Design a protein with these regions (language model features):
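An aromatic- and glycine-enriched ligand-binding surface/loop that stacks and positions planar moieties
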Residues: 33, 63-66, 82-243
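Conserved oxyanion/phosphate-binding beta-strand-loop segments in alpha/beta enzyme cores
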Residues: 242-250
Length: 300
């Protein structure tokens, strides 16, 4: 029974993961908790269930997963990437914060927004103060998303999709980043300045930020690790935003976060994809506390 419960726990985790994704996209969705034996089953055409009902089922699935999944440090090396108790807690944090703030600001029917925020807070506190299985990566923001940040040795990893050497499963991340992916100016403006303030309030932003190089001045250093400077080494030579080879970036801000120069050919990418990381837990914890209380007074 223990073995069966372990695999049921994995299935329940992914059911919660995907139902949460459906709720984010569609709101109310049909909640199907059985396999269909025949196409004549009336539930095939079942109507939508309230989003609160679906989210509560997600919590139940994740609670079961939390009881029966292994701790992340007990997962064998060959099974790295399988879901763990940490992943279940991380999903509770993600769902609780999202649903809590959604109900608070959109006033969707059913449930209490503070109850969802409390779910996120409780799960985050269990990870941060009780289990202490995770910590932030210390070897640089840029390396976090490259091969350096892979595996169990990086304690920031909570749940990742593992990609392998050629011949197994690979991706086109670096190739696509250098093809059509671009950051909008609106997203760029969310990067704070060194005084901790956004563009419209900062006292240290340059008088002009028309050129691409201007946008990096007195900015959160993570911006320079996320998009290219002009003439910075990139795919097929230095990045020149207004030349023909670089015009696939519709907004002129080319993404370099996660780009690996040696993996620019089709299906050659093998660095793992982070799905849940510890930084998300920390910032979600702070946000959930603020949304619940209107302030953050936790001395921890």
């Amino acid at each position: 029974q223990t073995i069966k419960d372990r695999w049921l726990a994995e299935a329940f985790f992914f059911r919660a993961y995907h139902y949460f994704d459906l709720v984010k996209k569609y709101g109310d969705v049909p909640l199907i908790l059985k396999a269909f034996d025949t196409t004549s089953d009336p539930d095939i055409k079942r109507g939508r269930d309230p989003r609160e009902t679906v989210i509560q089922q997600c919590y139940e699935d994740l609670d079961f997963a939390l009881q029966h999944l292994p701790e992340i440090d007990d997962i064998p090396e060959g099974d790295w990437g399988r879901v763990s108790q940490s992943a279940a807690l991380g999903m509770i944090v993600r769902i609780g914060l999202y649903e809590g703030t959604h109900k608070k600001y959109h006033q969707t029917p059913g449930g209490d927004y503070k109850a969802h925020l409390q779910k996120a807070i409780d799960a985050a506190e269990e990870m941060i103060y009780i289990r202490k299985d995770h910590e932030l990566y210390q070897n640089g923001f840029e390396k976090l998303f490259l091969h350096d940040g892979e595996g169990r040795q990086n304690k920031e990893n909570i749940f990742v999709k593992v990609y392998g050497p050629l011949g197994t499963i690979n991706h086109n991340n670096s190739r696509e980043l250098e093809s059509t992916v671009s950051m909008t100016r609106n997203m760029l403006d969310n990067f704070l300045y060194t005084d901790g303030l956004p563009r419209e309030k900062s006292q240290v932003r340059p008088l002009t930020d028309i050129s691409i190089d201007d946008i990096f001045i007195n900015r959160d250093p993570r911006l320079a690790m996320t998009i290219y400077h002009v003439n910075e080494k990139a795919y097929k030579g230095p990045y020149k935003p207004f030349e023909t080879n670089s015009q696939n970036h519709p907004f002129g801000y080319a993404i370099k976060k996660g780009f690996i120069l040696e993996e620019d050919q089709s299906n050659s990418g093998s660095n793992d994809k982070m799905i849940i990381r510890y930084a998300e837990i920390l910032i979600s914890y702070a946000e959930a506390l603020y949304e619940r209380d209107g302030s953050i007074s936790n001395p921890k």
